[in-house]
Amino acid sequence: MKYFKNIIFWNKLHPDEQKKILSRPILKENNFIKKTVKEIIENVRLFGNSALKKYTFLFDKQDINTFQVSKEKISSSSFYLSKVLKDSISVAQKNITCFHKAQIPSKIDVETEVGVRCEQIYLPLNSIGIYIPGGTAPLFSTVLMLAIPAKISGCKKIILCSPPPISNEVLYAAHICGIHDIYQVGGAQAIAALALGTETVPKVDKIFGPGNAYVTEAKLQVSSIFNGTEIDMLAGPSELLIIADNTANPDFIAADLLSQAEHGVSSQVILLTPCFELAEKVVLSINKQLNNLSRLSEILKTLKNSSVIIVKNLSECIEISNMYAPEHLIIQTQSPREVLNYISNASSIFLGLWSPESAGDYASGTNHVLPTYGKSITNSSLGLCDFQKRVLVQELTAKGLMKLSNTIEILSSAEKLQAHKNAVKIRVDFLKGKI
């Protein structure tokens, strides 16, 4: 059966049509969601745990009296998982730890002038919240992606929230990462609890993690409150762009496109290639592989937003890719690193035949929390720096201040900031014995 046959010739399209092809599925503003989330946040602020209990029963159909998961339940989660799964989680943990430890920044300590010492130091965030969605497929891999850099950074308090009942996979992943403050609360109410605090759930300084439209809206709203909780990013639907030439494997490409298409209705996958024969083989392979996949309805909805695009050459592939700024970029060409040199916008890049996007999702070591919706033009993938803050330190000796004093006084006078000038002058006068 032919589920997909959307091959497009880029240079036969009008510029407006080209723009439309690269447009993401529209994320419609939903006033009902905005209003509902605002009400949930306000009720959590006013009524704390009572509001959490009410919403947990309403949305999750769970009657929860104790939100915090006991340490016994967390540690016993190991007994419910197979050795094969636990060993695989350990491999992923090792690789993610290795890559993120390599991101530990070095302190900067320089003397810009004689007697003028400037430093940049890195301090961990005091408290962070991790949100892990529930559902039929618990995202325990995201626990690793968030908890491991938080621990390496030295965050003092790490709180995890997830809708009840929390899966043993999520509890186990949290346990091996050293997270023991876990609360069975989900949705917008969990984000509100982390941002505001309740009798049980502690308030945190920054919230990390994906979620549905309600969770995303809640993150947006709590981060907009004056002096409110910070957030990692507003994650959008998953997206993948592949650049391929005639050396690529069409079955591999089809499998990669489908791996992202199964994320859901608003996801988008695109293949760019100068090779029509390859494009035809990819389309055939997509239709063949679809017969063996379980999430067929989700994939078919995604494929309606997706395209196989024929272009003139690899240079045009690169130009279009940089314009699109994908979340995930796979380069399957004869010389992928040569193409990499010309890529300016992408969140996570996968080179060559043997680098499926799934590797980055789970176990290569890189983080899978990534900017979407073209945000890779200015934003970066999640990393150690998101769990830290840069602090600047300066120390001047008397000699150093004397040397800079004239410069500072002239500059502050030019900006008509007399008090700034005086803060230097009063010290200089003291050193000259005028006070």
From Swiss-Prot:
Pathway(s) the chain acts in: Amino-acid biosynthesis; L-histidine biosynthesis; L-histidine from 5-phospho-alpha-D-ribose 1-diphosphate: step 9/9
Matches recorded under SUPFAM superfamilies: ALDH-like (SSF53720)
Binding site residues for NAD(+): 131, 189, 212
Quaternary context: Homodimer.
Membership in a protein family: Belongs to the histidinol dehydrogenase family.
Job of this protein: Catalyzes the sequential NAD-dependent oxidations of L-histidinol to L-histidinaldehyde and then to L-histidine.
Protein name listed in UniProt: Histidinol dehydrogenase
Species in which this protein is naturally found: Buchnera aphidicola subsp. Acyrthosiphon pisum (strain APS) (Acyrthosiphon pisum symbiotic bacterium)
Chain's gene name: hisD
